[in-house]
Amino acid sequence: NIFYTDLDNTLIYSYKHEIGKAKRCVEIYQGREVSFLTEKTYQLLSELKKRIGIVPVTTRTMEQYHRIDLGIGKFRYALTCNGGVLLVNGEREQTWYEKSLEMVESSKTELQQAARCLERIKDRTFEVRLIEELFLFTKCRHSQIAARQLQENLQLRFADTLTNGEKLYVVPKVLNKGMALQRL
Protein backbone atom coordinates (compact mmCIF):
# COMPACT_ATOMS: atom_id res chain seq x y z
CA ASN A 1 0.00 0.00 0.00
CA ILE A 2 1.16 3.49 -0.86
CA PHE A 3 -0.10 6.89 0.30
CA TYR A 4 0.45 9.62 -2.28
CA THR A 5 0.17 13.17 -1.00
CA ASP A 6 0.72 16.74 -2.07
CA LEU A 7 2.77 18.85 0.31
CA ASP A 8 1.97 22.56 0.17
CA ASN A 9 -1.46 23.50 1.52
CA THR A 10 -2.16 19.82 2.19
CA LEU A 11 0.40 18.60 4.74
CA ILE A 12 2.48 21.73 5.18
CA TYR A 13 1.55 25.40 5.22
CA SER A 14 3.51 28.59 4.76
CA TYR A 15 3.94 31.09 7.55
CA LYS A 16 1.20 33.12 5.83
CA HIS A 17 -1.43 30.56 6.91
CA GLU A 18 -2.63 30.34 10.49
CA ILE A 19 -2.64 26.66 11.51
CA GLY A 20 -2.70 27.10 15.28
CA LYS A 21 -0.03 27.00 17.95
CA ALA A 22 0.53 23.21 17.94
CA LYS A 23 2.87 23.17 14.96
CA ARG A 24 6.47 22.45 14.04
CA CYS A 25 8.74 24.10 11.51
CA VAL A 26 9.54 21.87 8.52
CA GLU A 27 11.32 24.34 6.23
CA ILE A 28 13.87 27.08 6.80
CA TYR A 29 14.77 29.35 3.89
CA GLN A 30 17.34 32.13 4.07
CA GLY A 31 17.39 31.81 7.85
CA ARG A 32 13.60 32.17 8.22
CA GLU A 33 11.04 29.58 9.24
CA VAL A 34 8.75 29.45 6.21
CA SER A 35 6.72 26.21 6.32
CA PHE A 36 4.98 24.36 9.12
CA LEU A 37 3.24 21.09 9.90
CA THR A 38 0.59 20.69 12.60
CA GLU A 39 1.48 18.39 15.49
CA LYS A 40 -1.57 16.26 14.67
CA THR A 41 -0.43 15.82 11.05
CA TYR A 42 3.07 14.97 12.29
CA GLN A 43 1.68 12.26 14.61
CA LEU A 44 -0.53 10.78 11.89
CA LEU A 45 2.28 10.78 9.31
CA SER A 46 4.66 9.15 11.79
CA GLU A 47 2.19 6.31 12.36
CA LEU A 48 1.33 6.00 8.68
CA LYS A 49 4.99 5.79 7.63
CA LYS A 50 5.45 2.76 9.89
CA ARG A 51 2.69 0.92 8.01
CA ILE A 52 2.86 1.95 4.35
CA GLY A 53 4.99 3.82 1.86
CA ILE A 54 4.45 7.55 1.53
CA VAL A 55 5.20 9.29 -1.77
CA PRO A 56 5.15 13.11 -1.76
CA VAL A 57 3.92 14.62 -5.05
CA THR A 58 4.68 18.31 -5.51
CA THR A 59 5.16 21.15 -7.96
CA ARG A 60 8.23 22.15 -5.95
CA THR A 61 11.64 21.88 -7.56
CA MET A 62 14.14 19.33 -6.27
CA GLU A 63 15.96 22.10 -4.41
CA GLN A 64 12.75 23.32 -2.75
CA TYR A 65 11.72 19.77 -1.89
CA HIS A 66 15.08 19.04 -0.26
CA ARG A 67 14.60 22.00 2.11
CA ILE A 68 11.66 20.22 3.74
CA ASP A 69 12.20 18.01 6.78
CA LEU A 70 8.97 16.61 8.18
CA GLY A 71 10.86 15.00 11.06
CA ILE A 72 9.84 11.44 10.18
CA GLY A 73 12.81 10.43 8.03
CA LYS A 74 13.36 10.53 4.30
CA PHE A 75 11.00 9.04 1.72
CA ARG A 76 12.20 6.40 -0.72
CA TYR A 77 10.29 8.01 -3.59
CA ALA A 78 9.08 11.54 -4.30
CA LEU A 79 7.68 13.21 -7.40
CA THR A 80 8.79 16.83 -7.83
CA CYS A 81 8.36 19.40 -10.61
CA ASN A 82 4.67 18.49 -11.00
CA GLY A 83 5.63 14.87 -11.61
CA GLY A 84 8.38 15.58 -14.13
CA VAL A 85 11.17 14.49 -11.78
CA LEU A 86 11.15 11.24 -9.81
CA LEU A 87 13.47 11.15 -6.82
CA VAL A 88 14.67 7.76 -5.61
CA ASN A 89 16.35 8.03 -2.21
CA GLY A 90 16.68 11.77 -2.82
CA GLU A 91 18.39 11.46 -6.22
CA ARG A 92 16.91 12.24 -9.62
CA GLU A 93 16.04 9.12 -11.62
CA GLN A 94 17.48 9.99 -15.02
CA THR A 95 15.36 7.66 -17.19
CA TRP A 96 12.16 9.13 -15.71
CA TYR A 97 13.41 12.67 -16.28
CA GLU A 98 14.39 11.96 -19.90
CA LYS A 99 10.93 10.48 -20.56
CA SER A 100 9.38 13.63 -19.00
CA LEU A 101 11.42 15.80 -21.37
CA GLU A 102 10.17 13.73 -24.32
CA MET A 103 6.58 14.06 -23.10
CA VAL A 104 6.72 17.88 -22.94
CA GLU A 105 8.44 18.32 -26.30
CA SER A 106 5.16 19.15 -28.08
CA SER A 107 4.63 22.00 -25.58
CA LYS A 108 7.99 23.74 -26.13
CA THR A 109 6.75 26.31 -28.65
CA GLU A 110 3.83 27.30 -26.42
CA LEU A 111 6.13 27.55 -23.40
CA GLN A 112 8.48 29.84 -25.34
CA GLN A 113 5.57 32.03 -26.47
CA ALA A 114 4.20 32.13 -22.93
CA ALA A 115 7.62 33.12 -21.56
CA ARG A 116 7.78 36.07 -23.97
CA CYS A 117 4.28 37.17 -22.93
CA LEU A 118 5.05 36.79 -19.24
CA GLU A 119 8.19 38.91 -19.61
CA ARG A 120 5.95 41.80 -20.75
CA ILE A 121 3.47 41.60 -17.86
CA LYS A 122 3.79 44.81 -15.87
CA ASP A 123 2.64 43.50 -12.50
CA ARG A 124 5.10 40.60 -12.53
CA THR A 125 7.07 40.55 -9.25
CA PHE A 126 9.53 37.75 -10.05
CA GLU A 127 11.60 36.63 -13.00
CA VAL A 128 10.18 34.11 -15.48
CA ARG A 129 11.86 30.76 -14.90
CA LEU A 130 11.90 27.61 -17.01
CA ILE A 131 11.94 24.90 -14.34
CA GLU A 132 14.06 21.86 -15.25
CA GLU A 133 13.18 22.46 -18.94
CA LEU A 134 9.66 21.28 -18.04
CA PHE A 135 7.41 24.25 -17.19
CA LEU A 136 7.36 28.01 -16.54
CA PHE A 137 7.04 29.78 -13.21
CA THR A 138 6.74 33.41 -12.16
CA LYS A 139 4.88 35.58 -9.67
CA CYS A 140 2.40 38.36 -10.45
CA ARG A 141 0.31 40.64 -8.29
CA HIS A 142 -2.75 39.56 -10.29
CA SER A 143 -1.83 36.03 -11.37
CA GLN A 144 -5.36 34.99 -12.34
CA ILE A 145 -5.72 37.96 -14.70
CA ALA A 146 -2.30 37.20 -16.21
CA ALA A 147 -3.25 33.53 -16.65
CA ARG A 148 -6.49 34.49 -18.40
CA GLN A 149 -4.60 36.88 -20.71
CA LEU A 150 -2.14 34.12 -21.61
CA GLN A 151 -4.94 31.70 -22.42
CA GLU A 152 -6.77 34.25 -24.56
CA ASN A 153 -3.72 35.61 -26.39
CA LEU A 154 -1.94 32.33 -27.03
CA GLN A 155 -4.88 29.94 -27.35
CA LEU A 156 -2.88 27.28 -25.52
CA ARG A 157 -3.49 23.75 -26.78
CA PHE A 158 -0.63 21.82 -25.18
CA ALA A 159 -0.18 23.74 -21.92
CA ASP A 160 -2.34 24.94 -19.05
CA THR A 161 -2.00 27.91 -16.74
CA LEU A 162 -2.22 27.30 -13.00
CA THR A 163 -2.31 29.89 -10.24
CA ASN A 164 -1.79 29.70 -6.50
CA GLY A 165 -1.93 33.09 -4.85
CA GLU A 166 0.58 35.25 -6.71
CA LYS A 167 2.31 32.20 -8.23
CA LEU A 168 1.70 31.53 -11.91
CA TYR A 169 2.68 28.35 -13.72
CA VAL A 170 2.48 27.41 -17.39
CA VAL A 171 2.61 23.63 -17.44
CA PRO A 172 2.38 21.16 -20.34
CA LYS A 173 -0.94 19.29 -20.13
CA VAL A 174 0.91 15.97 -20.12
CA LEU A 175 2.90 17.02 -17.05
CA ASN A 176 0.51 16.64 -14.16
CA LYS A 177 0.53 14.85 -10.85
CA GLY A 178 -2.21 12.40 -11.80
CA MET A 179 -0.39 11.23 -14.92
CA ALA A 180 2.83 10.99 -12.91
CA LEU A 181 1.12 8.67 -10.44
CA GLN A 182 -0.07 6.49 -13.32
CA ARG A 183 3.49 6.36 -14.68
CA LEU A 184 4.86 5.39 -11.29
Question: Model-derived features: where do they sit?
Answer:
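Active-site phosphate-binding/coordination module
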Residues: 37-123
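A short local loop/turn or secondary-structure capping micro-motif enriched for an aromatic residue
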Residues: 21-22, 96, 179
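Conserved acidic, metal-coordinating active-site core of Asp-based
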Residues: 114-184
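Charge-dense, low-complexity intrinsically disordered segments
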Residues: 31-35, 105, 141, 171
